[in-house]
Regions:
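Charged (often Lys/Glu-rich) extended helix/loop segments that serve as interaction or gating elements
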Residues: 1-126
Length: 126
């Protein structure tokens, strides 16, 4: 979802601070690029923010990107900091992880489900 105002453009993305906390926690920079390069249109400056509704829920600020709503983005160099520092904040499922090796893409961890989150829960005896 893109939200453009007179002073700032926002790309509200599926990724959030619960997936990659480093930008919110200590302003870590991770390159964020569109998976498919657009031939049409021009790059605009965006803040890439998540849906968690916290002022610190961002993955990138002031990024020049040629994107439209629905585009798939790659967060580069997240590496071991992704899952190891992720959480279920706001009951969000942990993200899937992919590894890119040259031109091969491998799913190395499936996206978590609500059932995964609740697996260890127990109901008190009534």
């Amino acid at each position: 979802f893109l939200k453009c105002t007179e002073h700032k453009n926002f790309a509200i993305i599926d990724g959030a601070m619960n997936d990659l906390i480093r930008p919110a926690l200590y302003s870590a920079y991770m390159e964020i690029i569109p998976v498919d390069i657009r031939e049409e249109g021009e790059a605009r400056c965006f803040d890439l923010v998540g849906p968690v509704c916290e002022s610190s829920d961002f993955l990138g600020k002031d990024r020049e990107l040629n994107i439209e709503a629905g585009d798939l983005l790659a967060v580069c160099s997240a590496g071991a900091y992704g899952f190891g520092m992720s959480s279920n904040y706001n009951a969000r499922n942990r993200a899937a992880e992919v590894m890119v090796d040259d031109n091969q893409v491998h799913l190395i961890r499936k996206r978590e489900t609500i059932a995964d989150q609740l697996r260890g829960e127990a109901v008190l005896p009534g």
